[in-house]
Amino acid sequence: MDKTKITVVTIGHMPAEFNKGKVTSWNSSVFEITGEIESYTLTKDSDGSAWEFTDSSLEEVLPDTFQGDFLAAIVNVPLELNWYTRRLHNNRLVFTFHEIKEILIHSNIPLENIIYRLIYAYTLFYKRSGNKIQMTGEHTNFAHDETRGCLFDMNGIKTDIIYSCHNPIIYPNCIEKLKQEKVSNEVISKVQKEITRI
């Protein structure tokens, strides 16, 4: 089984508590982070009515070319609709520490845990979507509304994110969906084993 290759970058100022080295040194048999986590400057101002950065604005800031199968960009600014992650064109996604950082720190959860959780969730999403990251506007059934401590929790109430950032699971219904969408039993089993380290 080939590992999914992921390019991780940061855009703009990062929280002092975030350790990029921990993310690059994470050992997985399912994915591989390509190279080091490079840092880019946030060259635009917010363009949304609530001081958020819209998808179209971030499309212009994120690198267009990268080595991995998909690109995960980490920012520390508000995103469109106040979500904490958005899926963009060309197999790119963005995650923000905005509001999430304080929630994790308050619960004594390392900031890196949300990155591990999202990398596993998006790796499975990439595989079940035919090796692509579908855009935010595309209907995917990627996440569920109810908080279950699962990789695929929506976390519409952001404070619920703590339940999937410490010893997360893959909920049984989500496992069945992954199998129906042709993710191998071996990949699912490896992810289940590895996420116990989060």
Residue ranges and their predicted role:
Residues 1-76, 134, 162:
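N-terminal pre-first-transmembrane soluble regions of secretory-pathway and organelle membrane proteins
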Residues 78-90:
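Catalytic zinc-binding patch centered on the HExxH motif and its immediate surroundings
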Residues 97-138:
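Active-site recognition of the HExxH zinc-binding catalytic motif
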Residues 89-99:
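A short, glycine/acidic-enriched catalytic loop
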Residues 53, 81-84, 104-106:
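Active-site-adjacent loop/helix micro-motif of nuclease/hydrolase catalytic cores
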Residues 131-198:
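Metalloprotease/metallohydrolase-associated module, dominated by Zn2+-dependent proteases
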Residues 71-80, 107-117, 172-173:
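Hydrophobic transmembrane alpha-helix bundles
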